[in-house]
């Protein structure tokens, strides 16, 4: 099933835009409104699964927290394991960490050291692509553990912020269902 223009428009219309959130001048794309619509939520998962069902994926990695909401059902439908990447001190077993830059400072992500095996073919899934910093850090974690990442999939791509170009430079192909301007 290839995504039709009508299906993609349905998904786009299910995402509410909130002006001046979280601060003045920002137009926030609220993917939680898509989750409230079971038809839209199911369709978003179906379209991602369709794209990757024959790609040889062995693990799906989702980033905290909304990446879990899309990554886990994609992994389940593909019949592969799901691996969460989380903020520091949220995972109980031994982890490795990767820092990344925020607008005002840095943050860190962690992954269990035994979650990815050398040679795993990994799909990274998140709700939204903006600057690409979170996904870049996630890819570094996966690669440090020997996993191969070639694709990252998103529901929303804020296409004019530059995240896709940033990830393409790291050898990551980006796929998104719904493009929006970032400003």
Curated annotation (Swiss-Prot):
InterPro entries: Ade_phspho_trans, Adenine_PRTase, PRibTrfase_dom, PRTase-like. It is an enzyme of class 2 (transferase). GO terms for biological process: adenine salvage; AMP salvage; purine ribonucleoside salvage. It is found in: Cytoplasm. Keywords: Cytoplasm, Glycosyltransferase, Purine salvage, Transferase. Its main location: cytoplasm. It catalyses: AMP + diphosphate = 5-phospho-alpha-D-ribose 1-diphosphate + adenine. Pathway: Purine metabolism; AMP biosynthesis via salvage pathway; AMP from adenine: step 1/1. GO terms for cellular component: cytosol. It comes from the Bacteria. PROSITE patterns: PUR_PYR_PR_TRANSFER (PS00103). One of its GO terms (molecular function) is adenine phosphoribosyltransferase activity. The keyword Glycosyltransferase applies. The keyword Isomerase does not apply. Belongs to the purine/pyrimidine phosphoribosyltransferase family. Homodimer. Catalyzes a salvage reaction resulting in the formation of AMP, that is energically less costly than de novo synthesis. PANTHER family: ADENINE PHOSPHORIBOSYLTRANSFERASE, PHOSPHORIBOSYLTRANSFERASE DOMAIN-CONTAINING PROTEIN. This is Adenine phosphoribosyltransferase. It comes from Cronobacter sakazakii (strain ATCC BAA-894) (Enterobacter sakazakii).
